[in-house]
UniProtKB/Swiss-Prot annotation:
Disordered, as annotated region: 136-160
Classification via InterPro entries: Rib_uL2_dom2, Ribosomal_eL14, Ribosomal_eL14_dom, Translation_prot_SH3-like_sf
Keywords: Ribonucleoprotein, Ribosomal protein
Family: Belongs to the eukaryotic ribosomal protein eL14 family.
Biological-process GO terms, alphabetical: negative regulation of neuron apoptotic process; ribosomal large subunit biogenesis; translation
GO cellular component, one term: cytosolic large ribosomal subunit
Molecular-function annotations in GO: RNA binding; structural constituent of ribosome
Classification via CDD domains: eL14 (cd23702)
Protein's name in the database: Large ribosomal subunit protein eL14
Length: 160
């Protein structure tokens, strides 16, 4: 699969450092190999130059003319329904979960740990009942040790 996230006009990027950290911006123009002109009309980012080292390119791209004014970028952003697409993307969901997790207090962490313990207890009980049922049915359970012994027996038969 070839590389598809190019630095180009209309490419949506996520700012990774500085005061804009976490915000989405659209690349309007490439200034040089290290800097681009970005604009984020719906994310509260004014048009400014930004270092490429501080941007993470996304798979999203909106169509607008080269060096378009902010109003045209805003219109293209709204027309592409980018906010809804970004909200359901795995990248956004993971970032939201990290943010939620970092805001847990001590009691919330305790409740989370207790809930995980309860879930694991239920899973263990269900697994053990299934294991007992397969054992009582007489269905063969193939373990690595059994498999090794069966292979040795087959080799011994083949030699005779």
């Amino acid at each position: 699969m070839p590389f598809e996230r190019f630095v180009q006009t209309g490419r949506i990027a996520k700012a990774s450092a500085g005061p804009l950290k976490g915000r989405l911006v659209a690349i309007v123009d490439v200034i040089d190999q290290n800097r681009v002109l970005v604009d984020g009309p719906l994310t509260g980012v004014p048009r400014q130059e930004y270092r490429l080292n501080n941007l993470h390119l996304t798979k999203y791209r909106i169509k607008f003319p080269y060096t378009a004014p902010t109003r045209i970028v805003r219109k293209a952003w709204v027309d592409s329904d980018l906010k809804a697409q970004w909200k359901v993307s795995p990248w956004s969901v993971k970032a939201q979960n990290i943010c939620k997790r970092s805001q847990l207090n001590d009691f919330d962490r305790f409740k989370l740990r207790y809930a995980k313990r309860q879930r694991n207890k239920l899973l263990t009980i269900a697994f053990n009942t299934l294991k007992k049922r397969t054992k009582s049915d007489g269905t063969p359970r193939i373990l690595k040790k059994d498999r090794r012994e069966r292979l040795r027996a087959e080799k011994a038969k083949a030699k005779k």
